[in-house]
Amino acid sequence: MNRKFIITMLALCLVFVSHAQEHKIEHNFNLGVGVASLAKNDVHYSFRIGYGLNYYLAENWSVMPGVSYRAVFEDPFKGDVVGVESDDCSFIDVPVLLQYHQHARGEKGFVAELGPVFSFLTSNSTYYTDANPQDELNDKKMYKNFDFGIQPGVYYQTGKHWRFGVQAHIGFCNMLKKYPSINDSKRLNDVAATVNFSF
């Protein structure tokens, strides 16, 4: 009984060791700044910072779950406009990305990624009508708590650790909360220039 148990455990250890040698895990940190299609007549900016754990399925393919903080905000140098509310917001994103690596590990080449992203609202904006302080929308939250979308990206890897490219967020959900006087819809999208450090 003990011999069978030991042999079974040794066999499992050998499988895990060989599996670990065939597949590589890679840590990724990314930082991005870009623009977002949040306002009708005004450009908004986006900022993101995140971490991903990249698991290589094969030489050119990997899957990378991760977590990141993403903020969408107005031009910080514009100043407040009387009678116009701020519509800034931020999210914790949880993407699960499939990546294709054109090159061998640690070499120069392109990387393309695509996958679903689950977004959880961390800061909201509220409505405010300066011309009518009694408006029923005043102080009510604008956005829903959850969004679902996809996250495409393309990068150029310069060597063993650094990748530079473009990453986007495409939201599928109408993020505006339902109120009797609100008939609009708003999907949150952004594109960001991104730098990625991996090891």
Task: State the predicted function of each range.
Residues 1-30, 195-199:
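Bacterial Sec-dependent N-terminal signal peptides
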Residues 22-24, 40-46, 85-93, 141-147, ...:
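Transmembrane beta-barrel outer-membrane domains
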Residues 23-27, 33, 54-130, 189-199:
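Gram-negative (and chloroplast) outer-membrane scaffold detector with strong preference
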Residues 36-37, 137-139:
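Surface-exposed cleft-lining segments at the edges of enzyme active sites
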Residues 39-45, 75-82, 124-132, 176-182:
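Outer-membrane beta-barrel translocator domains and adjoining extracellular loop/strand segments
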Residues 46-54:
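Short catalytic helix/loop segments, enriched in acidic residues and glycine
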Residues 64-77, 89, 141, 150-199:
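Predominantly the C-terminal beta-signal and adjacent terminal strand-loop region
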